[in-house]
Amino acid sequence: STQKKLVTLGEYVSRMPEEQKYIYYASGDSVEAVDHLPQTELLKDRSMEILYFTDKTDEFIPDIFRTYGDKAFRSAVDGDLELGDEKQPETADHQETLDFLKETLGSRVDQVKASGKLKSHPVCLTSGEGMTFEMEKYFAAVQPDLALKAKRILEVNVEHPAFAALESARITDPDRAKKYAEILLNQAML
């Protein structure tokens, strides 16, 4: 990620900061698309290396190899990056709005939670453990009848102005708040 060119796993590991425990990877249609994923923001801010997977079958590599040397693979789109010092936001003050988001969005998301990894972005979708969004796309193209779905976790930056607007609207204008919820989900799906 720091050099945005093809690298071997050996080169990647040699450039990893000492405190980086995992081989982080993120997938997308292009280097530019991966580079702009909200989920990678915290890793990049910490100068962590990220493998950019741009081929549809790249996402199968971590499942096949699991490790390289003593380093395990971990998706940047997973819910927990296991950085050790990730700031977990206080949710007690925001739980009603998080519940409102889940209720409004229904089955389109499996879970809504406050995020400790977002900084400048209001929301992102993570897949948790198991199937990723890129794998879902791959299987949909190869076998459309299979209907395999990745888990969709909407992570929300409770310190972002967009969340503050949603929280205010939830109290004063619930119909407007529902529109904000739709906008946030659409933003996360981009």
Residue ranges and their predicted role:
Residues 1-190:
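Long, intrinsically disordered, charge-dense linkers/tails
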